Amino acid sequence: MESLNALLQGMGLMHLGAGQAIMLLVSLLLLWLAIAKKFEPLLLLPIGFGGLLSNIPEAGMALTALESLLAHHDAGQLAVIAAKLNCAPDVHAIKEALALALPSVQNQMENLAVDMGYTPGVLALFYKVAIGSGVAPLVIFMGVGAMTDFGPLLANPRTLLLGAAAQFGIFATVLGALTLNYFGLIAFTLPQAAAIGIIGGADGPTAIYLSGKLAPELLGAIAVAAYSYMALVPLIQPPIMRALTSEKERKIRMVQLRTVSKREKILFPVVLLLLVALLLPDAAPLLGMFCFGNLMRESGVVERLSDTVQNGLINIVTIFLGLSVGAKLVADKFLQPQTLGILLLGVIAFGIGTAAGVLMAKLLNLCSKNKINPLIGSAGVSAVPMAARVSNKVGLESNPQNFLLMHAMGPNVAGVIGSAIAAGVMLKYVLAM
């Protein structure tokens, strides 16, 4: 009987908590959305599967060595850690002390746990290498740059203003998060508010990069919100676009885009990087990788490298990025009131960004002879190319001969640049406080 009891106690089911059960269901929901509904499957599928692995009881695949030590509840080992942190020798007190400790102290405690015989889980290792270092989002940005054509933006530089206007959703959401905190509804710190705000840029890699730097404890919820709402762009944007434009405005036909020379396409990423990075060095990592990828594409002299970055490399990194995000889909981090706030603020951010882009297009039309169809303003959010396709679709509803896709790609690409710059602004000023 003792051996049977030991066997039963070793089963994961015997240790399954309510929080883990809920997170397993959430992970299965993400898998269903990815497979059945095709909602951002390239990211939601590995994120969902990573969530499943993270919430298997007793497996510890998403736990660091220190988290494994705390989960083991060995009184002697807890006393050693508590003595180093000058706190009470219980798990709750140790976690609170670690949250307030400097990164160097946290690393010391992690190394101490390793010395005691604990090892980090495989997903925790993925997270440390892919997101903790910031490498994975940067490599993906390089791949996005290699797949981006700046032609529509260069042919109509005014659309850069539409992409810039759409970033208003980011900063409005930061204020929204701080307002919730001010009124005591949901507690958000300034770094957390900044990380949540970047959802409004509709740029998954940027959201993950900034969250990893400013609010790693919210990364799972922010990434899920960002990619879920990106998939819902065709549902979120059209009602806002129709509400802010008249039938006459939606029928505006834009002039044919000029042909952009190869020299312009080669010079643009170099000039863009120098101009922005010299003024805002914190934006250099994201924008630098983006411009480097684009230069490989446009130069035409490294086709093998460009092809690798666009296909094999970005696909491999996407797998590890998704699994790493899934490592943060654990009950104690995800099942918090903050998650509801993130989901609410995320959809508001998308709405504000869409509206700001449309209104900026209308403003430009007041002082311009060559009219811009306001519908392309909504493409200023950097969900490439979905937002541009939505602009084209809504335009075709009003005028079946009015093809706006290439025109909308201008603000769409500008939105990618804008979100990278916004992330740089957040890093510079939030980390400085």
Swiss-Prot record:
Pfam families: OAD_beta (PF03977). Keywords: Cell membrane, Ion transport, Membrane, Sodium, Sodium transport, Translocase, Transmembrane, Transmembrane helix, Transport. Its cofactor is Na(+). The chain crosses the membrane at residues 16-36, 42-62, 122-142, 168-188, 190-210, 216-236, 266-286, 311-331, 340-360, 413-433. One of its GO terms (molecular function) is lyase activity. Its main location: membrane. Catalyzes the decarboxylation of oxaloacetate coupled to Na(+) translocation. Its EC number is 7.2.4.2. This is Oxaloacetate decarboxylase beta chain 2. PANTHER family: OXALOACETATE DECARBOXYLASE BETA CHAIN 2 (PTHR35806:SF1). Heterotrimer of an alpha, a beta and a gamma subunit. InterPro entries: OadB_MmdB. It is a multi-pass membrane protein. Belongs to the GcdB/MmdB/OadB family. It catalyses: oxaloacetate + 2 Na(+)(in) + H(+) = pyruvate + 2 Na(+)(out) + CO2. GO terms for cellular component: plasma membrane.
